[in-house]
Amino acid sequence: MYSKVFYNTLFYFVLASILYMLFLQTNEVLSISYKEALNYFENISLLTILTRISTTLFGQNDLALRLPFVVFYCLSVIFMYKIIDDYFKTAKDRFISIFIFMLLPGLLSAALLVNSAIVVTFLTIFYIYYYKVYKKHLYYALPFFLLVDNSFTILFLALFFYSFKDKDKKLLYISLALFVISFFVYEFRVDGRPQGFLLDTFGIYAAIFSPILFLYFLYAIYRTAVIKNIDLIWYISATALLLSIVASFRQKIYIEDFAPFVVIFVPTMMKIFLHSYRVRLKEFRKNYNIFVYIVLFFLFLNILLTFVNKPIYLLLDRANKHFVYEYHFAKEIAEELKKREMTNVVSPDKHLLLRLRFYKIEEYPDYFISQEAFYNYDEKITIKYYNKDIVNIYVKKL
């Protein structure tokens, strides 16, 4: 039996390894997408503030652009590790739980992209950590959450439900007021005809957790309610899950609004699984072992696809079918244009121009570029991954 110190050391080693891979991915592989460029240059939001501060401090590059979100991932994992300090009887089980949490497909993706999901995840985990340590709610942070993102409406509703269990009138009034305010400020729609997006929602949840893990998540939510061992985390995750299911009957939901509140249930889910596993003799653990192998297979497959996905282009007949196509090639195009001293360009593709602007390629009529071939172009620039053409840029000097 290894000591707690050993597993703590192993935890920080694994976290450091994941952070290294995330930094490598952000710096060497990903390019800014059109939506990310919109947030950086044109929108005014928390994402704009975070990315602008980071690029001001560390330079206008991909690593600086995504650095805040990798940091929020790191903090989310560390605070979750602290929250589950007394969840398990052994340090080994605690490590297994946080290991699964760290490798969640949805969490890793949120750490790599310019989006609010990982920020919401961290703030929610920090709120839970504060509540656990100090045995009181962080009331003063809740109005700030209202300004951060519309998805905190779900947290306010969960806290409203939890206030009845906790018999906390102050929490009841504050959470109800903030829920009503956020509902109207962010103009949530509940109209329209039923269209049935439930299967789509379940499919996205399966991608966030991995398919088998999501099925066990549903069971764990139900099981926790049956044995009446519900806590604040259960209220938050169950509220988000049920709300997303109900909303899916009428409209297509933005899963990033719900995902931060369901992934935090993973340690509780693992606690249920490991308890069921430990109480059985070895000869009766076969089905559980199969479950573990399947879950680990999908998690490591996800890691492979997250960090080594460019070879998938070799399997596709059209490059734009790649699931992260919109996060590729802009940086490479900018580098090729700079090599040719073509730093001022115009194009009918305004999305591409906004992406290139991040790499200091300005919109000015010195050169005309297009992804579509046209008569009498001067030069053709081809971006290749693993010797396969990904995108062609046709250039004409004006």
Please describe what each predicted stretch is.
Residues V119-H137:
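Specific aromatic-rich, kink-prone transmembrane helix
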Residues Y277-N309:
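Signature aromatic-anchored transmembrane alpha helix within multi-pass, membrane-resident enzymes
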Residues L15-L50, Q60-L63:
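Extracytoplasmic catalytic/substrate-binding loops of multi-pass membrane glycan-assembly enzymes
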Residues L67-Y87:
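Transmembrane-helix motifs of polytopic, lipid-linked glycan transferases
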Residues L305-I390:
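Short periplasmic/luminal acceptor-recognition loop of GT-C membrane glycosyltransferases, typified by
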Residues K252-R285:
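Hydrophobic/aromatic-rich transmembrane helices and adjacent perimembrane loops
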Residues S109-A117:
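Short acidic/glycine- and proline-prone juxtamembrane loop motifs at membrane-interface regions
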Residues M80-L103, T121:
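Transmembrane-helix signature of polytopic, membrane-embedded enzymes
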